[in-house]
Amino acid sequence: EKMKKNNIFQSSRFFCDVYCFETGQEQKGHVHGDQDKIYLVLEGQGRFSVGNEQRVLGPGEGTFAPAGEAHGVVNHTNARLRVLVFVAPNPA
């Protein structure tokens, strides 16, 4: 089962989603050629990878994935992970 994306807001310049990951769910590593992405953890803990760096982040912590850099998220815990995500510019 895939993690769930809930759109909060979008404009022609950026969008904001909340990603919800249950235990074991992940967003596999991928690259956005022209978009920067910011992850901010709202609830739970997750393993975030950006480029060659991996970090476990919890509530109130975040990371930045610049355009062209591989990034992904794994919920490696037994609790739900909720993440606020900003992407700019909006590819839509």
Feature roles, as predicted:
Residues E1-G29, Q35, F86:
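A short glycine-rich, His/Asp/Glu-containing loop-to-beta-strand
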Residues F14, Q45, E53-R55:
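Well-ordered beta-strand scaffold positions
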Residues E26-K28, R47, T63, A67-V73:
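Histidine-centered metal-chelating micro-motifs
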Residues H32-G33, T77:
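Short glycine/proline-enriched turns and hinge-like loops at secondary-structure junctions
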Residues D34-D36, V41-G46:
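Glycine- and acidic-residue-biased ligand/ion/polar-headgroup-sensing regions
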Residues E43, G51, F86-A88:
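Cofactor-binding loop segments of dinucleotide-utilizing enzymes, especially the Rossmann-like FAD-
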Residues E53-A67:
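Short acidic-glycine-tyrosine-enriched beta hairpin
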Residues A67-P91:
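Ligand-binding loop in jelly-roll beta-barrel domains
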